[in-house]
A protein has these predicted regions:
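Glycosyltransferases and closely related glycan-assembly transferases
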Residues: 12-22, 31-43, 192
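Nucleotide-sugar donor-binding patch of glycosyltransferase catalytic domains
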Residues: 49-50, 188-250
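Single conserved hydrophobic/aromatic residue that forms the stacking wall/gate
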Residues: 1-6, 10
Length: 250
């Protein structure tokens, strides 16, 4: 909600629905004022003006505790066993190989680790392991360039998932032994599916890739922490990814 006109639209929409209460997972005073003007009596919200130092998991947990809900920080997604078996058959997934999800997409350019980093990691794994890589990404032009670059070198051992829906991809992820993902939707989905997930953190707070016990964050070389505007995608080290990969699957 970035303009007065947009705020007016939101106020009308909210008021027309006659809500009794609202939950605002944000510290914005603007959202609170819109809800008050719309006549909502009970407003549950993160503490105001605390966004900069806010712990996104703890803030949400404390907010939900106000209505006696206790939520863990390790969300889980359940996939029907029959769908997992069906994906195994449809994609000829072999348990004799290490099946690896590569989440190569991302919501912004600064989150998209360059193709050469993934290719170097693939090259390292092939020296010691027999692997199949499932490439999960969207249709964004930059994402497609990353996808094509990887396929140009490793087409025989890579399967692209960019034409599959999320519901089709979930059982495939569940068949994987491990995932290596940018900070993207696939890192969260993979971890929630109880698959060990190495998260490549280049430009967002470390917490986003470490809140789950299934997440193993990798940060750029030369940095002790990572946050918004770290711009570290060129400093992600494939050898560090491989070292973490070996420690997880061994």
């Amino acid at each position: 909600v970035k303009s007065s006109a947009a705020s007016d639209v939101y106020k009308r929409q909210i008021k027309n629905n006659s809500f009794d209460k609202v939950f605002i997972f944000n510290s914005s005073i603007r959202y609170r004022l819109i809800c008050k003007i719309a006549g909502i009596k009970r407003i549950f919200q993160y503490p105001l003006f605390e966004k900069k130092e806010q712990h996104v998991i703890e803030a949400a947990q404390k907010l939900l505790e106000k209505i006696d809900l206790k939520v863990e920080s390790n969300p889980q997604i359940k996939v029907d066993e029959s769908l997992i078996k069906l994906a195994e058959q449809n994609f000829s997934i072999s348990k004799n190989k290490i099946n690896i999800l590569l989440g190569i997409g991302g919501s912004g350019s600064s989150k998209r680790i360059p193709a050469n980093k993934f290719k170097q990691f693939i090259e390292l794994t092939l020296k010691d392991y027999e692997c199949i890589f499932y490439l999960a990404t969207g249709k964004n032009q930059e994402e497609q360039l990353i996808l094509k670059s990887i396929l140009s070198s490793y087409k025989e051992i890579c399967i692209s998932l960019d034409n599959n829906s999320i519901s089709e991809i979930l059982p495939i992820i569940k068949n994987c032994k491990i995932s290596i993902c940018n900070d993207s939707s696939f890192s969260h989905l993979s971890a929630a599916l109880n698959v060990p997930t190495i998260v490549l953190m280049s430009d967002t707070p470390l917490l986003y890739g470490s809140y789950s016990p299934n997440m193993y964050p990798i940060i750029p070389d030369g940095m002790e922490n990572v946050s918004h505007n770290s711009r570290g995608k060129e400093k992600i080290n494939p050898e560090k990814i491989f070292k973490k990969f070996k420690s997880i699957i061994s």
